[in-house]
Swiss-Prot record:
Catalyzed reaction equations: dUTP + H2O = dUMP + diphosphate + H(+)
NCBIfam families with a match to the protein in the record: dut, PRK00601.1
Organism per entry: Crocosphaera subtropica (strain ATCC 51142 / BH68) (Cyanothece sp. (strain ATCC 51142))
Protein family per UniProt: Belongs to the dUTPase family.
Protein name: Deoxyuridine 5'-triphosphate nucleotidohydrolase
Gene Ontology terms describing biological process: dUMP biosynthetic process; dUTP catabolic process
Function: This enzyme is involved in nucleotide metabolism: it produces dUMP, the immediate precursor of thymidine nucleotides and it decreases the intracellular concentration of dUTP so that uracil cannot be incorporated into DNA.
Length: 142
């Protein structure tokens, strides 16, 4: 399976897998952005992609940024639809107590390509019964 990628900026870095068995391609910032404590910012990657049919790209946090700096992706996972052709941006949020500086060339998130199953919607009067029923939000214990 292939993804077509355009570099929209000269300094953009094409995403790559850091290791052969990784599921996420590293996305890299093309700009320097300061994210104050408790705030979020859109960080640009300088690339645009064309996904294969029936796939999506999921934007996920990097565990090292989350653990060491409390930086994560705000709308996790962010979804890039198959038809989107604009620049990929990542909404990062700073949950830390100090301001955090994203620098040009920093790996800021992971992009995982996943299959999409499109369904037909059927409106019904009633759903089938299950053992769980309507139990949710802690109904099976903490």
């Amino acid at each position: 399976m292939q993804i077509k990628i355009i570099k929209l900026k000269e300094k953009a870095i094409i995403p790559k897998y850091e290791h052969d068995n990784d599921s996420g391609l590293d996305l890299v910032s093309t700009e320097t952005v300061e994210i104050p404590s408790g705030e979020s910012k859109l960080v640009k990657t300088g690339i645009s992609i064309e996904l294969p049919p029936n796939t999506e790209a999921q934007i996920r946090p990097r565990s090292g940024l989350a653990l060491k700096h409390q930086i994560t992706v705000l709308n996790t996972p962010g979804t890039i639809d198959e038809g989107y052709r604009g620049e990929i941006g990542v909404i990062l949020i700073n949950h830390g107590k100090r301001s955090f500086k994203v620098t040009e060339g920093m790996r800021i998130a992971q992009m995982v390509i996943a299959p999409v199953i499109r369904v037909k919607i059927q409106e019904v009067e009633q759903l089938s019964d299950t053992i769980r029923g309507q139990g949710g939000f802690g109904s099976t214990g903490v």
